[in-house]
């Protein structure tokens, strides 16, 4: 299925059913009192985070969603049925914004599986005419109309939730690495931008199968990515939720005069996009050591040691050095990103004073 991480949709909650204007009519009781029932409430629209979903593709196919209306009230004090709620399943990590005129407002971040959020409240059902009987009004010929359901225009943005993000220049071997560390099977080829969408893989501890870690293979970043060049900043946002980064550099991209230029280019793009990303712990990895001559590999390791950098030298193709990298990844498992907690503002209920009243005339 095609990976889609941003869509705009509209949602309309159900309208409340109208209250009924009715009077008791039985044998020997030609002029009974009012007995109109209440209308049913309209259905709500609810968003639910679903860990089985990885894309917003379905919401690009269908752009408008409407919940069921409430039934109107009936005579003999019979109330209308409530409209059925519409529950829309979204990938974990989806952020919802409401669009009002030319502005946009944050509503909710579905950052945990199973989280539900009432995005649009159904209209309340109108009260039947039996509610308006009084000592001075014995035959009320009016009832409340059902309230309109809330309607909203929304932008949905998916930011992948992963423990670690695998980043680097194009063709650094990131896809091969994630396939070696997990059961993911991304498209792999020897040319830049093979990965056009983020790939997810789950890394499982051989000694403890319940110990798992989610990896995200982020498409290759080039100089100017923060300004939209290459695959652009559309994928940089997927790094924001990771706890730490695995920064991969191909041995073929190492220059003797400036061996770590590849690391610097990517880090500069991260800094330009969001300077807080530079606080994220990075595991520096040099990949494709199998294609190097032993003398050159030895020289690069000496340069790394003299620079004070801790760098893991691996070959994702042959598996050389993978075991040491895996140990380092598990040591960072408990690392937590100190993200600010966002308090959600609940949807407020309206007072009865805001309810409309419909006047309905009936014949005696």
From Swiss-Prot:
Predominant cellular place of this UniProt entry's protein: cytoplasm
UniProt keyword terms in alphabetical order: Cytoplasm, GTP-binding, Hydrolase, Magnesium, Metal-binding, Nucleotide-binding
Protein EC: 3.6.5.-
Keyword Hydrolase applies: yes
GO cellular component, one term: cytoplasm
Pfam families, alphabetized: GTP1_OBG, MMR_HSR1
Domain OBG-type G: 162-334
Necessary cofactors: Mg(2+)
Statement: the UniProt record of this protein carries the keyword Cell inner membrane: no
Binding of Mg(2+), residues: 175, 195
GO terms (BP aspect): ribosome biogenesis
Binding positions (GTP): 168-175, 193-197, 217-220, 287-290, 315-317
Domain of life (superkingdom): Bacteria
Compartmental location: Cytoplasm
Domain Obg residues, every copy: 1-161
Enzyme class, spelled out: hydrolase
Gene Ontology MF term list: GTP binding; GTPase activity; magnesium ion binding
Description of how the protein assembles with itself and partners: Monomer.
Family: Belongs to the TRAFAC class OBG-HflX-like GTPase superfamily. OBG GTPase family.
Function: An essential GTPase which binds GTP, GDP and possibly (p)ppGpp with moderate affinity, with high nucleotide exchange rates and a fairly low GTP hydrolysis rate. Plays a role in control of the cell cycle, stress response, ribosome biogenesis and in those bacteria that undergo differentiation, in morphogenesis control.
HAMAP family: GTPase_Obg (MF_01454)
The name this protein goes by in its record: GTPase Obg
């Amino acid at each position: 299925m095609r990976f889609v991480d941003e869509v705009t949709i509209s949602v309309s909650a159900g309208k409340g059913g109208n209250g009924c204007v009715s009077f008791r009519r039985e044998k020997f009781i030609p002029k009974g009192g009012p007995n109109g029932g209440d209308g049913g409430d309209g259905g709500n629209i609810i968003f639910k985070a679903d860990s089985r979903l990885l894309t917003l593709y379905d919401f690009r196919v269908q752009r408008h969603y409407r919940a069921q209306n409430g039934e109107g009230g009936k005579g003999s004090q019979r109330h209308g049925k409530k409209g059925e709620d519409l529950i829309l399943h979204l990938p974990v990590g989806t952020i919802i914004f409401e669009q009002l005129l030319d502005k946009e407002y944050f509503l909710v971040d579905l950052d945990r599986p199973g989280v539900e959020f009432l995005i649009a409240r159904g209209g309340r059902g109108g009260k039947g005419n039996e509610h308006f009987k009084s000592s001075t009004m014995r035959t009320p010929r009016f009832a409340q109309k059902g309230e309109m359901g809330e309607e909203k225009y929304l932008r949905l943005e998916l930011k992948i939730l992963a423990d670690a993000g695998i980043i680097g220049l194009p063709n650094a071997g990131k896809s091969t690495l994630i396939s070696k560390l997990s059961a993911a099977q991304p498209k792999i080829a020897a040319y830049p931008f093979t990965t056009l969408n983020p790939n997810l893989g789950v890394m499982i501890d051989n000694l403890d199968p319940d110990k798992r870690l989610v990896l995200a293979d982020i498409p290759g970043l080039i100089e100017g990515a923060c300004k939209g060049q290459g695959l652009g900043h559309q994928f940089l946002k997927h790094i924001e939720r990771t706890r730490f980064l695995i920064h991969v550099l191909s041995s073929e991209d190492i220059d003797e005069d400036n061996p770590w230029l590849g690391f610097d280019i990517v880090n500069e793009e991260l800094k330009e996009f969001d300077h807080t990303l530079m606080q994220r712990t990075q595991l520096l990895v040099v990949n494709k050591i199998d294609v190097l001559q032993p003398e050159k590999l030895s020289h690069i390791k000496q340069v790394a040691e003299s620079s004070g950098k801790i760098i893991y030298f691996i070959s994702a193709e042959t598996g050389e050095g993978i075991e040491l990298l895996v140990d380092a990844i598990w040591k960072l498992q408990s690392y937590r990103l100190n993200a600010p907690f966002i308090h959600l503002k609940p949807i407020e209920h309206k007072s009865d004073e805001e309810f409309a009243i419909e006047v309905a005339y009936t014949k005696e």
